[in-house]
Structure formats: C-alpha cells, structure tokens
C-alpha cells in the first residue's frame, strides 16, 4: 500500500510541505499540461521523479495551481457567466462544461463539473484545497473565479492534464458561482451558486458534501499520504507499515497546520483566490468550501494507511477547513467543521482499527498474489499454445486466413477473458498489498504481459476485421462491410482499432490508431468513431476478449492510456463548446497530444492528449494501472465524461512521466477529485477491462467509442447477459459500473440513449433516461435532494449527483455510470467515456450530462454495474461505497450496528453520511451525495486503492458478515424506501456477480441511488463487492435471520419421524433406501417386542425381513437341564438355550455386535437393520450411528418409554428393579441431531390386534381343552410310539389303531400272508380321487396308475414332447396291466 502511495506522486506533494506559497507553476514538468495538471502533476512528478522533497513538490504544485487558478479566474469569471446562459455558445463554458458544463443553467454548468466527472470535480476541489492549504488561495479562488480557464481544462485535454486541478476549474466555469470547491462536491455542488442552492436539498447535501468531501478529502489525503509515503523520503519507505503510518500521520498534522496557516494567509491574501472560493462555496454551500479545504487536507492527511490516515486526516482537514470557513465566513462553516471533527474522530478510530487489521491481511494478500502469479503463468502457457500461426498462413486464401484468425480469436477470447479476470484479481490484490513496492518486478512483468495480451487481442480483432472487410468488399453483401455498424453491433470488428492493434506488442500503437479513428470525427464522426472504439470495446455483454479484436484492442489502448480515449472525447466534442475548453487546456497545459484549444475544439486536444497517454500510459500505466484501476474505477464513475477528457491529458502527463508519475498524478487527481477521478476513469477503466490498460482507455476509451459505444452498449446490453460474464470476469469489475448501467436491462444501453446526445440531444435528457434508472437505484433514496437541485434534469434520480451538478450531474452521472461502467467493463474505456463524452458533447448545451457521472458516476447504475462488476476482478480494489464497512474490517455484528456511512470506516465522511442515510430518505439522499463525492475521492486517491485492498481483505473475512448485515440494512432501507431495490439487487446478482458484489450496495444503490452511487463509484470494490454482494445479497436477510435460528435450534426438539411413514405406504415409497433403527430403552420396556413388530410390519408390506441384531442374543447360553421325559417318565438331561446376563461381558459383547453390525453394513445385503440393546449410554450407540451414516444409511432412534415398575415386571431376563431404577437415573439423552422414530402408532396397532386376540381367547382355550381331552383319552388306550409317518391321521395309522397291522411281522403263516394280501389288495374307496400329498407315502398300483395316466392323456388328446398314441388309444387297459410286470430298479 505504501509503495502505492509512493507511486502516486500525488500523495507525496500533499505531505508536510503544504505551506509553500503559490508561486507560478514551474517546478513540475507536468505543470505544462495545464494548471490543473500541474497540481496533479506535481504529485506525479515527485513520485515519478527522484521524489522531490514534499516541500518542493508542494511549492511547485502550489505555484502551478496558483497560476492555473489565476488564469481560471480570468477565464472562468467571464466564461462562467457565458456558460450558464449559453451552454454550447460560450466557448469557455463549453470548455468548462465540455458539453455538460454548459448545461442550461448555471447549475448546469456546475453539473458539467460533475459531469466532467465527479472525480474531476473532486480533483478540482482537491486542487483548490491543495492550493488553499498549500497557500494557493489564489488557486482556489481562481477555480471559483476563473471557470473560463477551467472550461478550457475541461475540454478534456486540459483537465486531464491538470488531473485534478484543472477538472475543478472546469466545473467552476460552468458553475463558478458554486465555487471551485463545489466542483469537488460534484454531486452536491455541481452547479454555480444557483446549482448549489438546488443542491441545498443537497446542501444538507452541502453538509453532506462537506462531509462527503471530507471522506473524499480523507481519500485524497490518503492518496496524498500514499504519495507522500511512497514518493516521500526514503525514511518512510524503510519503515514498517505501522511506523510509516505514524510518521505520515505526524507529517500530515504538520503539513495540515502549515497549510492552515498558509490557507488563512492565502484566503486573506487573495480574497479573489482562496477566499473567493470559500465565499462562493459558502454562498452556495459553506459546506463545500469547508469540504474543499478539508478535502485537500484529508487528501493530504491520509498519508499512510488509507483507513488510519483517513481517520486522522479528517481531523486535520477539519481544522484547516474550520479556519477557512471562519476566514471565508459562515457559521455553517463552523458547523461543518464540527461535523468534520466528529467524522475525523470516527475516522481516527477506524484508522486505529484498520492498523490492527492491516498486518494480518498482508500475509493472506501475499499468498493470494502468488496464487495469481501461478494462474497467470498457466494462462500464459495456454496463450503460447493458442497463438501459433502456420508459417504459410500468409500464402493461404482469404477465407482460410479469415477462418484461421477467427478461430484463433475465438480461442484467444476465452483465454483473454480468463487472463483479464485473473490479471484484475492480481492487480487488485497487488494494490491492496501494503508492500507492493517489493513486487515491482512482478508488476512490470505482468503488466508487460497484460499489454501484450491486449495487443494480441487488438491484433486478432484487427486481423479478423480486416479480412472480414476485404471479404465483405468482395462479396458485397456481407453484414460486416460496414465496420462501424458491425463495431457498434459486434465487438469483434474493430477496423478503426486495427491500426492500434496492429502493433500487438505495443498496446499504445493500438491506442493511437483508435485516437485517430476517433479524431477523424470531431463532432459528426464521433458516432462512427465510437463504433470503432466500441469495436475495440466489446459490448458490455460481450467480454472484451469475446468481442473480437476490438475489445482486446481497447485493452491495449488502455495501456496506451489515453490514446484511444482521446479519440472518444472528440466525438463527445461534437458541440463546439468542448473545444473551447481545449484552448484553455492547451494554454494551461498543452499536453503532448492535446493541441491548442484552437485545435479541433477539444477534439484535437482530446485526441492529442489521449494519444500521448496512450503510449505513455501504456508503459507506465501497465505497472501502475492496477492501482489506478482500483482507485480510478470509482473516480471514473464519478467523472467518466469529464474524466475521459481529462484522463487523456492526464494520461499524457502520466505517459510523459513514468508510471509512478501517472500514479502520482492520479493520486493528485485523487487529491483533487476531478483529476484523480478522470485518471481513474481512464486508467481504471482500462485496468478493469484490461487490467493494465486502465489509464489510457480512461478518458479516450470511455469517450472515444461513446457514439458507437452507445450502439455497442445496446448490442452489448443484449449480449451482456450472455457474453459479458466472460468479459465480466476481466473487465467488468472496473467497467462494471459503467457497464452495469447499460448492462442492466433496466436502463437503455448507454449507447441506446447516448447516441441521441451525440446527435445533439442534451445528454442529460438522453443519457438521463438510462441514468435515472441506473441511478435511481442509487439516487432514488436521494432523489429528493438532488432532484430539487436539478430541476433541469428530467432524470431526478441522479439528482444526488446534482448536488453540484443538478440535472447535468444526474445525467452525466448516469451516463457516466453507464459509460464508465460500460467502458470499464468493456475494457474499452473509450467506449464508456466516449459515449459519455458524446453525451457530454451533445449535452454540452445541457450541463446535466456531465454532472451525473461525477459523484454518482462512481456509483454507476447498480443494474449496469453488475455486468461490469464481474469483469472486475479488481472490484475489491475499487473502494465501493458499499464497502464502507469493509474498509474497517469490522465484525459482522459491528457492521450491522454501523450505518452505511459508519460502515465506511476508511472514508472520513462516509460514516456520518451513512448514518444519515440510515436515518431517513432525505438524510440518505444527502449521504448519497456525500457518498458520491466521497466515492470519487476514494476513486481518485490511490489511498482508495489501499482502502479497497484492505477492504477487500477485510471483506474476504469480515466483509461477508458485515456485508450481509450492511446489505441487509441497505436492503431494509431500500425496501422501506422503495421495493425496487430488492429487484435491483436480484437483478444485479443475476446479471453479474461483480455487480452482485457491489450488489449489496448496488441493490441499495437502486433504492438509495444516492447512497449506493458512491459505492458503485469504485468499480474495483464493486468487482470484489460483486462477490460479496452476492453473498451479501442472499445473506443480508439470512444474516439477521440466521442468527436467531441458532438459538431456536438449541431449543428445538430433535427431528422425529413416524414409523408409519417408513413401514406403511405411501410413506415407504419415498423412504430412504437403507435404514437402521436403533432401539434403546430400559430392560423390559419392549425393545425386542417393538423390533419384532417392525420386522413383521416390514415383511407384511412386501419388504425383506430386516436384520435384527440383539445384544440379548449374546447372553444366551446353552445350559443343560434335567427334564422329565413325558414318554418314559425318566429324568433326562437336555441342553436348553437360556438368557444369562453377565455384566462383565457386556462391553465385549457390544464390541462384537458392532463388528457384526459393520460387516452387515459392508455386505449391503440387508437394507433394513434393527439394533436391539438397552443403549442407556450415548457412547453405546453413537458408533453404530456414525458407522451407519458413513455407509449411507438413514439412522432412526426408537426410544422406548415405560414405567420402571412395569419394566421390572415385564423384563424376561430377570433384571432386578433396583438395577432398572439405577439405569433410569443415569439415563443419557440422545444427541439432538439424531432422528427419532415415533413407534407409538406401531404399538397401538399391536394393542388393537391383542384386543382382537382376546376376543377369540375363549374359543381358543376351548379348542385347547378339547385337544387336551382327546390326547388324554388317546393316552389311556396305551402308549403308541409315534413315527414320522404318523404325523397326522392316515390310513396306515388308522389301520394300526384298528389293530389290523400290529403283528404283521410276527405272523408268518400263509393265512396271515393271504389275509394280509387281501387286505392289501383291497382298494380304498377313494383311490381314484386320492391325491398324493408331499411328505406322505401311499400305496399305488402300477396298472391303475398307468390307466389313470392314459385316461388323463386321452382327455388332453396329446402328450407334450412325445405322444404315445398306443397308450392314449388303449381303452381296454391291456397296456396298463403290463405295468404290473415291469421291474423298477431303485
């Protein structure tokens, strides 16, 4: 984290040396881009260069800022008036409003500021604050007084250069009255004083703004702090993170004090300068002025740990702010100061907590980063396999080559999506890693690869597009022929981009081509250009990689940074006004690519500016990009439209400077919301989409494709659900916010409504339609406040942004959300920005367009966001407003307790605002505005990145719970406010995990658009949030719901099953296939009886007899007993099986039974097993339960209950009552998780049967008595030995009983023989009909049997197998008689 700050030069300039007077901007090279840029540049330069001393950096920055502000005051004062009345006509205004600055009323111009980009506004505020703090009172006043210059800056070119300062000036031009500070407050104070007044609903929004700004300030401070830390002196770098934090905090306090002193003099010195700003702010919203002061201070203050620093910084900012307020004027200032103090205290507490949580996170972060390294390497290995060309591919036919490249592109798209997703996750993790400076080599390596991957994507897209174009030209009837249309409709075609793509290795080249493409259409071409850009930027729905080459191309542009984006801005410039701003830009800072203001009215500047960023950004941004992406993403949301313009210049500056510079500038932007946001928007978008390419696309990409992007967004919107997921994984996170707007079906695709703005409709109205929906999720809560401020804007939902940019803010935010989201998500930041820019251009007349994005931008429409979110692997880096709680890593409970605002521990202002939000709709709205402001802050400051990272870490652990709780709260508020939130929530969840991530917040966003917008603002977090929100979304209710259940569970009775449901139909049809019933009960309670009943019932209904394992069987022994033989009357010893209980053997037997039980389970022969044992102790049957469960059996516990006395009488094993009582006293209750079997119905059935049996008992007894009598009579006749042949009454037995056969063997005389023969030959009367019975022997006569057989066969008429006709036809019986002579051998 600290390295990150260092990287962001911006933070370094913020540190201790804030006192330096405001000499002309000289020191920083980056100052050249423009005053605004100088401020941003100053930070960047220090960080980028050999870390100038903070004091030197401050001095240089202050000088530059002063110069810039002076120019701005001159220009803004005049243009300011112009802009409000004539939106497009006043060039200055246009410049300032860039299409949004000029919005209808002065408020509109302010909205332009916001429209410019909430980030820019914030940046502007930061600049103002910095100047004020640093002693550039003039600077602030300048911003306020000289919006004209600001307008020039807004042209998109200048602003970006000023990164943060210029953007603020921009807003001033349009809404100078509000105050330069107000620009920072984009949402609350987008418009001039008038707008500010509209924001008054926002002014609470104003207060909120102040508060929000404070968070923003803290964010800026964090960034500043980060810059200070990273860029600062070697000492901090050598310190441990905690030491650094303490060191930076001390430095911050020191610098804040110095700045306060300087500030006061500055205000006194230049009432026009510093004081001017405060006054306007105070007039419109004293809060803003204070906010401004606090913001810069805050930006400065949070040097080290975003959370910690943030907490302390707010206090310092508050002090300066209060001083400023007092100097400026207003008791309101004092009130705000107190508020800020409270917030600062809260932040300090949060910071302390954050510090504690920080180190634990670092270990996990490092592991996560290493895992990402491994996954990225695996993807690269796959990439090596995919990107292989046949050496003779050039010689092959057009069709073959086209198919080859299409197939390769298709394969690469999936790979690229995986890469983007993993890279963004890696980037997020890296940026959240406090010691990322130790991983710079890794970062360079992966960013180089990121550029290479994007270049490949662009290259393949270009190849496919070129072949398709050629083929379509030949075929003439190809749908592809119109590249623009295809581009807008299909991400694959990116003819425009091809040039950039052509240098696959060089993403920047790709970017520049995009620029030219964009450049061609200054105002008209924009639509075409956007298509090409969109081509590079696949529709949100389509993953960048999916969208053929273009998306990839866009990513490279992202690397190139502003290369492509600038192009897009030109489209936005369609209105002349944007161009006007350009001149100021060039005057302020004729950045590398930005032509003089005279250039194509903003188009050249944009193009130029973007182009340099493209190349520079590409290189420097790749390493840094991740970080930027994290921070910028929110910013870009906040100020996508403006950001696109400024980002390019900023990118240029960044490009000119090393990545560090870019980051530093970005941080500068972070400090000055506007610029940071723009950079973030530009960079972040790429990062999100491309991971490394965030910076370049930032402005240009988002802007470039605006026109086509609108179309594309529509197409992508359609595709979003299908293809976006892939892309969502990589790009969506950053772009998700931009994309989400278009993504959600809820709002027309950004392109959908956007195209009209380019046509000339005010983007506000056109964009707004979509924006309001998207925003509605966010602003809904806040709409009241914002809505009043922006009467002009038809879409009041965005009003929260309107705080500063009333309608414009709304529109712009919406559009910005869409664009930023879209662009970010798309990886073609151009597209998002471009469409936004287009809208801005179209909206130039209506400032509203620009304003919407600034604050709310950071919170893109929740709906769209989801789509973008998935791509955002970095989502976590993005510090989503939703993550307010995440930052502090508070326990879930704590999170629940903490209101939305409080949740955002890391952000100074958020807590109070959030609380307000919780408090009521209006409050929520205000909070929403603040959040928006804050969001941009978070977006812009690198610190925010840290916050996001830390938050992400926390999110990973605590965030889930907290998110659930918070989300639940949000959902609850949303539901109360408007049911729509839930739908949004689910919509986002369904739509995108990323959005879902943000989902928790996003859902609320829908409801409380104002609240959530900030959250959406940071896409990175959104991405991460996406993940959590999903959890959150589902969990929110559960979080509350689940907690109670645990208690009830404990009280809840064990689950029970009725035995009839298992044994009787229809229950037995659906019962488990394998069942084990464990009987337990006292001896004599009827266990064995019930086991038999169960067995019998199972058999009764057709089941196999269950296996009954009874412990009693083990106690049955063979015993010899003397019994009296009934026959002989003698005493005979017989072996009998009897039950003999041996307590010593019980355990042994139980073990043996367990083995048998396991064997039975393993055999699987018995699907129904019954265990019959006392089982008075749980340990006796627990192992049986576990073993059965392991084998997939459903185990039921059948507990017998009976009175001890009854058991003593009934038990057949002779157990004494004393034993039974003792057993009952020590009876153990079965575990609750074991299913009980209710056997009462079985016993009832048995009882009924017994009753029936009793009815028949009388008869049965009578029958028994009769039998006994018969037996007695029989025995009286004499003893008759029984044989097995005499089992029942048979003739033989009767003959014997009759004495006919008694002495057969003794009579050997012939008479006896003869008599016997006669008797023997005498046929029984029933011989013919007698049937043989099994087990019984009877006499048969062969001839008679033969005759019977013949008769039977004759009746049948044939014999199966072989028919013996002789036998059948023999009626005389001669054949049968022969049978008597047959000899049968046995």
Curated annotation (Swiss-Prot):
Q: Where is this protein chiefly located?
A: nucleus
| Glycyl lysine isopeptide (Lys-Gly) (interchain with G-Cter in SUMO2) cross-link, renumbered residues | 894, 951
What is the annotated localization of this protein? Nucleus; Nucleus speckle
Sequence positions bearing N6-methyllysine: 683
**Compositional bias of kind Low complexity:** 31-50, 59-80, 762-779
> Region entry Disordered: which residue ranges?
1-336, 517-1068
- List where Polar residues composition bias occurs: 237-259, 651-667
* Pfam families named in the record: AAA_33 (PF13671)
Q: How does it assemble?
A: Interacts with PPP1CA and NCOA5. Forms a complex with ILF2, ILF3, KHDRBS1, RBMX, NCOA5 and PPP1CA.
Role this protein plays: Plays a role in the reduction of telomerase activity during differentiation of embryonic stem cells by binding to the core promoter of TERT and controlling its down-regulation.
The identity of this protein, by name, is YLP motif-containing protein 1
Organism, as annotated: Mus musculus
